[in-house]
Amino acid sequence: SXAAVVEPPETSQNRIAKGE
């Protein structure tokens, strides 16, 4: 994830799961 990157909802879920 990056600040300039627009992520789909599933990517947000994966980021949370990774603890990032």
UniProtKB/Swiss-Prot annotation:
GO cellular component, one term: endoplasmic reticulum membrane
Keyword Endoplasmic reticulum: yes
Annotated localization: Microsome membrane; Endoplasmic reticulum membrane
Alphabetized UniProt keyword annotations: Endoplasmic reticulum, Membrane, Microsome
Note: On the 2D-gel its MW is: 60 kDa.
Function per UniProt: May have spermidine-binding activity.
Protein name in the entry: Putative 60 kDa spermidine-binding protein
Origin species: Zea mays (Maize)
